[in-house]
Swiss-Prot record:
Keywords: Metal-binding, Nucleus, Ribonucleoprotein, RNA-binding, Zinc, Zinc-finger. Signal peptide: none annotated. The lineage of its organism: Eukaryota, Fungi, Fungi incertae sedis, Chytridiomycota, Chytridiomycota incertae sedis. This is U1 small nuclear ribonucleoprotein C. Residues 105-127 have a biased composition (Pro residues). A zinc finger (Matrin-type) spans 11-43.
Length: 228
């Protein structure tokens, strides 16, 4: 603060004709999240770039993703006039949806009228349970199943090797699923400079991801001028 009580104007803001009194990341972030700054950015791009040109760049990038078949790209669903979801763009066809004649369906597994299942048989008394009545007197009941077979399944026959913390030998194990990489990172990692310019421009304008970057602004304008 100066002697006359006025803060010095030391920092400028992109897209806005104002100055900040403090040049710090927190002050710039607080300014860039305001509605006035976003409105100035929108007016700046509407005055400098044709909206039809912006949409054509976005459509070209979207089509390039679909043609390349990159993993992790969100499928584009066409919505019909009746509100039902259509077929995904560039994907296999889906089976038709079942037709419901009004009303919500009943609970699953309920039998039709007059076809109720038979009643469950009565439980035998404790002294007549299966498996215990056939045992001779004075003999103790069998103990619990061995470790790893607590769900009631039968243990494998003798001689079958069992893997620790894994499936039984002879069964196929499920292959590990590779982590899905975002298509933007794949595109930026190994493609041409032109594609990188397109992705940078999309990040800069749609949505407002790097509003305080003059370099991304000039990159976007350069690509739009040389795209035709």
């Amino acid at each position: 603060m100066t002697m006359d009580g006025v803060f010095p104007l030391t920092a400028t803001v992109d897209y806005c004709d104002i100055f900040l009194t403090h040049d710090s990341a927190s002050v710039r972030k607080a300014h860039n999240t305001g509605w006035k700054h976003k409105m100035q950015v929108e007016h700046y791009y509407n005055a400098e770039v044709d909206p039809a040109k912006i949409q054509s760049v976005i459509d070209n990038v979207t089509k390039a993703y679909i043609d390349a078949g990159l993993p992790g790209f969100p499928e584009l669903i066409a919505v019909g006039v009746n509100g039902q979801r259509g077929q995904p763009v560039g994907g296999p066809p889906r089976p038709p949806q079942p037709f419901h004649n009004g009303g919500r369906p009943g609970p699953p597994g309920r039998p039709p009228m007059g076809m109720f299942p038979p009643q469950r048989p009565m439980m035998p008394p404790p002294h007549m349970r299966p498996g215990l009545s056939q045992m001779p007197p004075g003999m103790r009941p069998p103990g619990p199943p061995p470790h790893g077979f607590m769900n009631g399944s039968m243990p494998p026959p003798l001689g079958t090797p069992v893997m620790e913390n894994g499936p039984v030998a002879g069964q196929q194990s499920q292959a590990p699923v590779a982590p899905r990489i975002h298509p933007d990172r794949l595109r930026l990692a190994g493609n041409s400079i032109k594609s990188k310019l397109v992705i940078e421009s999309i990040y800069c304008f749609y949505p407002f991801g790097c509003l305080d970057s003059q370099i991304a602004t000039h990159t976007f304008l350069y690509h739009c001028a040389n795209d035709s």
